[in-house]
């Protein structure tokens, strides 16, 4: 299996093979997932102090915060899958 990566902003990359979902952080359940990830020590903040616009959840239950739109991350994900 070929390892592919997704740029999630500011030079940060995530393994495309490990991504389970890419969601917006606006809803209460996603905010709970973010807080749970923080408590478990599995939260990765890749926003560089900017507003969180996308939450990426991996198969290892890591929660990754990104400051780019979920649609942009998803488009990069789909573009990488086509290669």
Curated annotation (Swiss-Prot):
Pfam families: RemA-like (PF04025). Belongs to the RemA family. InterPro entries: RemA-like. The lineage of its organism: Bacteria, Bacillati, Cyanobacteriota, Cyanophyceae, Oscillatoriophycideae. This is Putative regulatory protein Tery_2835.
């Amino acid at each position: 299996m070929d390892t592919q990566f997704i740029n999630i902003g500011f030079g940060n990359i995530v393994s495309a093979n490990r991504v389970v979902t890419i969601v917006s952080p606006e809803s209460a359940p996603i905010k709970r997932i973010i807080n749970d990830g923080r408590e478990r020590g599995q939260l990765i903040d890749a926003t560089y102090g900017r507003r969180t616009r996308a939450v990426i959840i991996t198969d290892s239950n890591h929660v990754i915060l990104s400051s780019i739109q979920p649609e942009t991350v998803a488009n990069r994900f789909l573009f990488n899958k086509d290669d």
